[in-house]
């Protein structure tokens, strides 16, 4: 997209930076059991997650995240879709070492908010993910009818929402404050930001979404921030026809 392509990059979902500054991604480990003669007798996909850099991952066969598993977490098919280095191949299940944790791990959080991304033209997806950053927060927000499941996590991790510190019961709510009595009997007081100016010149306004007497859990959204509705990221309006 223009001369600045490649200058601004975003981490893929689930990726993180290790102590040496390299990008690491998580993979589910495939546990293999051999008999005394070295023959494979069992292979199960575990919930144990291992982070690897790209050069380490190159040495292993990695199955796709949407490869079907049975109830005991064994591969359903004898041959599975996997990759090794730059090759996408169909390979015997017994040769698989790891499995992707999610189909969306290759895209950023913004791209993962695009519904039916796999049916989208790649240029449109590129423009759409970039343009989400340019959205101006609306005065009256509307959560998306068609969503991908990333909206709540993106909103709560944005830092603009007010989250409950502890479990408790809401005792007082007004436009400026929320008070929650926690399990220890102490009162947690939350002050809301009202009509403040952001660095981009947009309006930061937090609105409470809980009611007096409501039970809340630690980490639950107490007040929406800008471009949020009911704890979900809400950048635009639903285009309704008819």
Sequence positions of predicted segments:
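Acidic, glycine-anchored pre-beta loop/turn
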Residues: 207-216
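Long, charge-dense accessory insertions within large macromolecular proteins
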Residues: 1, 8-16, 22-207, 220-242
């Amino acid at each position: 997209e223009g001369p600045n392509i490649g200058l601004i990059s975003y981490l893929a979902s689930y990726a993180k930076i290790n102590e040496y500054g390299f990008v690491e991604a998580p993979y589910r480990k495939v546990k293999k059991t051999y008999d005394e003669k070295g023959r494979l007798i069992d292979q199960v996909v575990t919930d144990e997650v291992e982070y690897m850099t790209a050069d380490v991952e190159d040495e292993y066969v990695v199955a796709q995240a949407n490869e079907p598993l049975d109830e005991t977490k064994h591969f359903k098919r004898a041959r599975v879709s996997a990759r090794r280095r730059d090759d996408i191949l169909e390979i015997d299940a017994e040769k698989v070492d790891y499995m992707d944790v999610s189909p969306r791990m290759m895209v950023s959080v913004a791209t993962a908010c695009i519904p039916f991304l796999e049916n989208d033209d790649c240029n449109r997806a590129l423009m759409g993910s970039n343009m989400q950053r340019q959205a101006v927060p609306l005065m009256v927000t509307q959560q998306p009818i068609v969503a991908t499941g990333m909206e709540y996590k993106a909103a709560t991790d944005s830092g603009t929402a007010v989250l409950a510190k502890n479990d408790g019961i809401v005792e007082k709510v007004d436009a400026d404050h929320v008070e929650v009595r926690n399990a220890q009997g102490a009162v947690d007081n939350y002050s809301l930001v009202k009509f403040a100016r952001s660095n981009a010149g947009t309006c930061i306004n937090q609105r409470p979404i809980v009611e007096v007497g409501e039970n809340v859990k630690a980490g639950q959204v107490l007040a929406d921030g800008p471009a949020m509705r009911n704890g979900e990221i809400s950048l635009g309006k639903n285009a309704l026809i008819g």
